[in-house]
């Protein structure tokens, strides 16, 4: 495990409990709370400008730092909107790429992690939707609509805290960790106070494969709630494109030794997904989020197959390693009416914008 990955694991463990480290860092969390409240007030009072796009905007983000499963929700949402007749476009910060002063806009497989960032490239490859990236999401939205005027709804990948762009729908994605110890950074894992969840339109909880939690029921009060499980699909060979059922990798006759690697916000969730599918990868290599694959981390691994996430796969294509297989995941929601409900909200927003 890389040092930065070890530090992240250390922080995650402490963020689940209100122990000595949280107590020690509490004064710094008070500064975070002051900064968050001050910044929000500046936007609410008009001291900072807010861009209003001419189409509805849906933000999918979180208040828990790190990976909670936002990207699969973005992909599922874009696909669901397209099925319902919308032409969605996506905006993102473009983390992992050097964007420069001007937004970068592209569509489909022309996007690469180096040019547009890891998650934007993955979303573009999975959906074919146009994607614009820039740290200032208002600029990204303007560039997106300029180059793709047919876009009639913008989905923001992350950006719940990016208040410089007006939004019509907010979806918060969390996982079984919930709000951790409930404290703001650095004493806890939260970017904003836990009460922020009361103001969003919907909360999707990404459940672990073996979670025994009772499915969240949709409620008529407060945010609409749904559970999500990420179900693995057939593995795809990175070099040939061939597909094989995931069960094949549990067959010692086909693959005597299977390893796994993940450079995502929560690698253990990916490994747990593989184990829940009946696989027993060894070793499980937890890499830092947004890992740079220009140098292979797999040379010391003795295995017949190495299973990686889709986010890692798009960065591993330049590696000459025939052992690499991508394991895509599909988001399955407990609320079958969620996307119809979201579409109804979007139509209301579009009508209000047109007036």
UniProtKB/Swiss-Prot annotation:
ATP binds at residues 64-71. Coiled coil: none annotated. The keyword Membrane does not apply. GO terms for molecular function: ATP binding; tetraacyldisaccharide 4'-kinase activity. Residues 208-222 have a biased composition (Low complexity). GO terms for biological process: lipid A biosynthetic process; lipopolysaccharide core region biosynthetic process. Residues 206-226 are annotated as: Disordered. It comes from the Bacteria. The keyword Disulfide bond does not apply. It catalyses: a lipid A disaccharide + ATP = a lipid IVA + ADP + H(+). Pathway: Glycolipid biosynthesis; lipid IV(A) biosynthesis; lipid IV(A) from (3R)-3-hydroxytetradecanoyl-[acyl-carrier-protein] and UDP-N-acetyl-alpha-D-glucosamine: step 6/6. Transfers the gamma-phosphate of ATP to the 4'-position of a tetraacyldisaccharide 1-phosphate intermediate (termed DS-1-P) to form tetraacyldisaccharide 1,4'-bis-phosphate (lipid IVA). NCBIfam families: lpxK. This is Tetraacyldisaccharide 4'-kinase. The gene is lpxK.
